[in-house]
Amino acid sequence: MAAAVRMNIQMLLEAADYLERREREAEHGYASMLPYNNKDRDALKRRNKSKKNNSSSRSTHNEMEKNRRAHLRLCLEKLKGLVPLGPESSRHTTLSLLTKAKLHIKKLEDCDRKAVHQIDQLQREQRHLKRQLEKLGIERIRMDSIGSTVSSERSDSDREEIDVDVESTDYLTGDLDWSSSSVSDSDERGSMQSLGSDEGYSSTSIKRIKLQDSHKACLGL
């Protein structure tokens, strides 16, 4: 009972409020809408809010689309500078530009693969040459060691030969002294013999002359 009374009172208050608004609107010269209950009022608020949201989202979408197209134009201009288009680059459409860009990208990828293959080959050759250099270094160290050993052995043999030569020189010097003394003695004996022979030859000649003189004297007699 009390609840029904409160509802009636609320309806009377809303009606009075409506009448007051109509009077004010009539005074200002414009009509007013029919009174709404709470549900209608909430629905109206939601509709207005959705309209505002839709208009806001639409304006946001338009702004984003505008920015996207501006960015796309900028990217196409940069792409024209990267892709070789030829002398008539200003007449190319967006489709032809993208087609040439695709072909150019494929060509660059092929060049990149070839470069990677060549780099791998050069790296393998470098590793091979490095191993060869290490082997040559080890071989050089070994040869230097062998050469130093041979030179040390050769120097030892040279010293031994020098010692042998000195000893043989001393021995030959003694032989030469003995032979020289023998030669001098033989020379003296030879000179004495020659001297004797000369003396014998002289005496024989004298005797022969004397015999000739005596023979001549006899013939003269």
From Swiss-Prot:
GO (cellular component) term, any one: nucleus
Motif placement: Nuclear localization signal: 21-49
Cell compartment(s), UniProt: Nucleus
Source lineage: Eukaryota, Metazoa, Chordata, Craniata, Vertebrata
Modifications after synthesis and translation: Ubiquitinated by BIRC2/c-IAP1, leading to its subsequent degradation by the proteasome.
Mitochondrion keyword on record: no
Database matches in InterPro entries: bHLH_dom, HLH_DNA-bd_sf, MXD1_bHLHzip
Disulfide links within the chain: none
Pfam families per the UniProt record, alphabetical: HLH
CDD domains (UniProt xref): bHLHzip_Mad1
Physiological role: Component of a transcriptional repressor complex together with MAX. In complex with MAX binds to the core DNA sequence 5'-CAC[GA]TG-3'. Antagonizes MYC transcriptional activity by competing with MYC for MAX binding. Binds to the TERT promoter and represses telomerase expression, possibly by interfering with MYC binding.
Region (Disordered): 30-68, 173-204
Record text on subunit structure and interactions: Heterodimer with MAX; the interaction is required for DNA-binding. DNA binding requires dimerization with another bHLH protein; does not form homodimers, and does not bind to DNA in the absence of MAX in vitro. Interacts with RNF17.
Domain bHLH intervals: 56-108
Keywords: DNA-binding, Nucleus, Repressor, Transcription, Transcription regulation, Ubl conjugation
GO molecular function per UniProt: DNA-binding transcription factor activity, RNA polymerase II-specific; DNA-binding transcription repressor activity, RNA polymerase II-specific; protein dimerization activity; RNA polymerase II cis-regulatory region sequence-specific DNA binding
Top-level lineage group: Eukaryota
GO biological process: negative regulation of transcription by RNA polymerase II; regulation of transcription by RNA polymerase II
Composition bias type Low complexity, residue spans: 175-184
Biased composition (Polar residues): 191-204
Protein name: Max dimerization protein 1
PROSITE patterns: BHLH (PS50888)
